[in-house]
From Swiss-Prot:
Disulfide bonds: none annotated. GO terms for cellular component: KICSTOR complex; lysosomal membrane. It is found in: Lysosome membrane. This is KICSTOR subunit 2. Keywords: Lysosome, Membrane. May be part of the KICSTOR complex. The gene is kics2. As part of the KICSTOR complex may function in the amino acid-sensing branch of the TORC1 signaling pathway. It comes from Xenopus laevis. The keyword Membrane applies.
């Protein structure tokens, strides 16, 4: 590309850089106002520049709608409203067509009054077309995630593959230095989402260290993202004069990613409670602050209803290289578990798993596998020989929660079934996907 050298191009470049800087800081309204003011004050501008300014104003509006996730619909007064007319796909398609016009106009303006400017705008618009296409695909991806919230089990590994394919497709497609704020923001968002989905899958696979690494990476990148909002100030003008400033409210997408990370952290802290409890007291304090605090909820339930034990059982039969709690060297070898050891209690409260009850627990899991595999039923079993009652449910494949009482309890007792249903639903992760929709009470 011929480097733009004229004073005019420099002036236009300044407008563009300020616009993309605002957009990179998620200041959509400032970005939109900036180009609209330029358009209003420069009505004699050439065709390409006028088209570009109009397209950029629409880009700012589209990005605001995208980050607000309003295209998923919004609950208002109990009713679900979908703004089909203003759907993100319609907005982006219209914007794509506008940018294509700038590309064509710029290429046809050979020998015009500002060839360097025409070439720059054509080049930027071409790359922005890829940016728009990438966001259309990511918006579709979020819609897919939201749709999956109604499923009993979500295969996060499949989602990671789809997301990585999108990232690979558009990698380095909008690399112009002027667009670097957009490229950085896109990369940050997709990286955070990929880390979280990988962590979700790795927790399900019961892989401690890789899950921890992905959660940590997501946390670090969300902190970087959050600092952008902390630096943004919104000025509010008061009715009777005067004004005040407050930190800008992050968009729904960022808040949702934070929520998703916190839910995964809570699940991680529960599934790997044994390994984490061996850490420093500071680590214990940090994991106790998770929301929900599964350890705290279960401990309260045990005290209130005098349960002997609540365990999370991991069926290791389909797992490769199961090695037990904590860190393990990648090349270390451990013989595969056999017999009852194929069903370890990866979490057991208030103390170690009650070994005398384990044959019964495994028998119930085997006999009632069809009910448990529905991932929604609570199974009840009373053994009069040992005067003990067992309640079991399965939040996701390979994991079963069992509550043991050394007394007779009715299967109609809603205290126990409600507790297990709530615990199971919370661990599934489908609630996190459902809360992608703005206004969701999930």
């Amino acid at each position: 590309m011929i480097p733009p050298t004229s004073a005019q191009v420099t002036a236009e470049q300044n407008v563009l850089q300020t616009f993309f800087s605002h957009l990179g800081n998620f200041s959509y309204d400032k970005a939109k106002d900036h180009v609209e003011k330029e358009k209003e004050g420069n009505k004699s501008a050439g065709a390409s520049w006028s088209l570009m300014l109009a397209a950029l104003a629409h880009l700012a509006a589209a990005q605001k709608a995208y980050h607000s996730m309003s295209f998923l619909g919004q609950k208002q007064g109990g009713q679900l409203f979908f703004s089909r007319k203003d759907s993100i796909r319609t907005n982006y398609t219209s914007l794509y067509n506008e940018l294509k016009k700038v590309v064509t106009t710029g290429r046809n303006a050979v020998g015009g009054t500002a060839p360097h400017l025409e070439e720059l705008l054509s080049h930027l618009s071409e790359q922005l077309c890829y940016f728009v296409q990438a966001h259309m695909e990511i918006a579709d991806f979020y819609e897919k995630m939201y749709t999956l919230s109604s499923q009993k089990f979500i295969n996060a590994e499949e989602l990671v593959k789809i997301l990585e394919a999108i990232l690979k497709k558009y990698s380095s497609r909008f690399h112009h230095p002027t667009l670097s704020p957009l490229e950085s923001g896109f990369q940050l968002e997709v990286d955070v989402l990929a880390h979280l989905l990988k962590a979700q899958f790795l927790i399900y696979e019961w892989k401690f260290l890789p899950a921890l690494v992905n959660l940590h990476n997501a946390h670090t990148k969300l902190q970087t993202w959050g600092q952008i909002f902390e630096k943004q100030k919104e000025t509010k003008k008061h009715l009777f004069g005067g004004q005040s400033q407050k930190v800008a409210q992050p968009p729904h997408l960022f808040l949702w990613l934070m929520k998703f990370k916190n839910l995964l952290l809570a699940k991680f802290s529960f599934y790997f409670h044994e390994a984490l409890s061996r850490q420093t007291s500071e680590m214990k304090t940090l994991t106790a602050k998770t929301n929900p605090d599964y350890f705290g909820k279960i401990s309260s339930f045990i005290r209130k209803y005098d349960a002997v034990n609540v365990s999370l059982i991991y069926d290791t039969r389909g797992s490769e290289n199961f090695q037990g709690h904590g860190y393990h060297h990648p090349d270390s070898y451990r013989e595969a578990p056999k017999g009852m050891d194929q069903y370890p209690a990866v979490v057991s409260l208030p103390n170690d798993r009650p070994i005398m009850h384990w044959p019964n627990v495994i028998m119930i899991m085997t006999d009632k596998s069809a009910d448990l595999n529905t991932l929604e039923k609570v199974v009840h079993f009373y053994d009069d020989k040992v005067q003990s009652t067992y309640f079991l449910t399965r939040p996701e494949p390979n994991f079963t929660i069992v509550v043991i009482f050394e007394s007779k309890k009715s299967e109609r007792d809603s205290h126990f079934t409600s507790f297990l249903n709530e615990l199971s639903q919370s661990l599934k992760g489908s609630r996190a996907f459902a809360s992608l929709k703005p206004g969701s009470k999930v």
